[in-house]
């Protein structure tokens, strides 16, 4: 993590180093939380100088930094440090934030007030740039960015200076959630739940509703759930804000957030609201809703390769399901669907269909289904020829 240690294409190496650093700090935290907290600060200081020259266009490194800091911040916040020690830490973090070239340290700025811990420190860092920020936000003729604005808002919030925070935000020409979230939280901490909900939800009604949507939705969702309005929270904010790198991850995210709701219903709601039904096959299959999975498998956007793997994996434990999935895969291949399909995919799918049907004594019925598919004159010629060849081999073997 030395300055300039990573070159343009070193994103993967940098991410691995972050993982190692996080592991080291967590290990130390079990025995010496103060030293571990200082490790978090040292890491924060080194991130920008070390990663400055890396190509971050994919977003992978930024996400990794964000996750790392969010995971480590509790160590820094909860460390049993006295006021003098924390004052030193805050100066170091403030310097790192000011030097940060791409806002890597945003998670630290967001929780700066919590890191400060002591009232005097919260007020000190809230007041330092208050006049400058007030002047910058009052000048609507020019745009002025103040690097310490977020940490200042965090300190105002944690110091309990809620009305002052709201008055400051009211000066801004544009409303963006990365700052407005402090105002929403300030209203909520005063016990004005409905006002906080309206404040946050109002940001979804302007032209910038897509930026920061998930953060706004989660805030509103939290209020409604606290009020016992789970259905409203789910329909208005939970379902639209489901997130994950895969369709299965999106479903699991919602199931975890709404343990009181039927998991099957959540899956069906996601499919209906997000579309691309065929893409949900793997999620439905893994969730063990096989009837839903079969419905997904029949859709034109289902991936034949995924269906073929499922036919293989389920041939023993769910042979009827495997047969149907394999037949859908063949139908898609005949229609020319799939990513770089090969005639060998037909061979594999047919093999899984026949193997699964043999376990239930339905080989003849499976063969008739294959013949029905082979009767499609409009099918891809190469795929069709391969299917007919496979059928001939089966019939020859039966004979």
Model-identified regions with their sequence ranges:
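Eukaryote-biased, non-catalytic alpha-solenoid scaffold regions
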Residues: 1-399
């Amino acid at each position: 993590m030395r300055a300039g240690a990573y070159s343009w294409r070193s994103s993967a190496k940098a991410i691995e180093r972050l993982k190692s650093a996080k592991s080291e700090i967590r290990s130390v935290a079990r025995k010496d939380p103060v030293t571990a907290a200082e490790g978090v600060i040292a890491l924060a200081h080194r991130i920008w100088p070390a990663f400055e020259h890396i190509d971050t266009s994919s977003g992978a490194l930024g996400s990794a930094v964000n996750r790392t800091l969010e995971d480590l911040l509790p160590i820094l916040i909860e460390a049993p440090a006295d006021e003098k020690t924390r004052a030193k830490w805050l100066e170091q973090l403030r310097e790192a934030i000011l030097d940060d070239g791409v806002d890597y340290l945003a998670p630290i700025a967001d929780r700066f007030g919590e890191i400060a811990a002591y009232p005097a420190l919260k007020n000190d860092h809230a007041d330092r740039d208050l006049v400058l920020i007030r002047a910058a936000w009052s000048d609507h003729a020019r745009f002025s960015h103040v690097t310490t604005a977020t940490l200042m808002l965090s300190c105002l919030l944690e110091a309990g200076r809620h009305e002052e925070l709201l008055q400051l935000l009211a000066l801004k020409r544009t409303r963006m959630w990365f700052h407005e979230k402090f105002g929403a939280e300030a209203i909520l901490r005063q016990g004005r739940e409905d006002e906080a909900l309206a404040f946050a939800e109002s940001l979804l009604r302007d032209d910038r509703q897509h930026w920061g949507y998930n953060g706004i939705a989660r805030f509103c969702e939290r209020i409604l759930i606290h009020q016992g309005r789970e259905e409203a929270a789910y329909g208005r904010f939970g379902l639209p804000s489901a997130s994950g790198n895969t369709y299965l991850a999106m479903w699991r995210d919602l199931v975890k957030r709404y343990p009181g709701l039927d998991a099957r219903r959540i899956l069906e709601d996601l499919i209906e609201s997000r579309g691309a039904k065929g893409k949900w096959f793997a999620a439905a299959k893994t969730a063990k809703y096989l009837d839903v999975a079969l419905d997904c498998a029949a859709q034109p956007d289902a991936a034949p390769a995924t269906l073929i793997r499922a036919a293989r994996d389920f041939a023993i434990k769910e042979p009827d399901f495997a047969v149907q999935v394999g037949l859908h895969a063949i139908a898609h291949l005949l229609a020319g669907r799939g990513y770089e399909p090969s005639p060998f995919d037909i061979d594999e799918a047919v093999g899984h269909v026949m193997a699964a049907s043999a376990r239930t004594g339905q080989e003849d019925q499976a063969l008739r289904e294959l013949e029905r598919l082979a009767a499609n004159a409009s099918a891809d010629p190469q795929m069709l020829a391969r299917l007919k060849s496979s059928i001939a081999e089966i019939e020859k073997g039966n004979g």
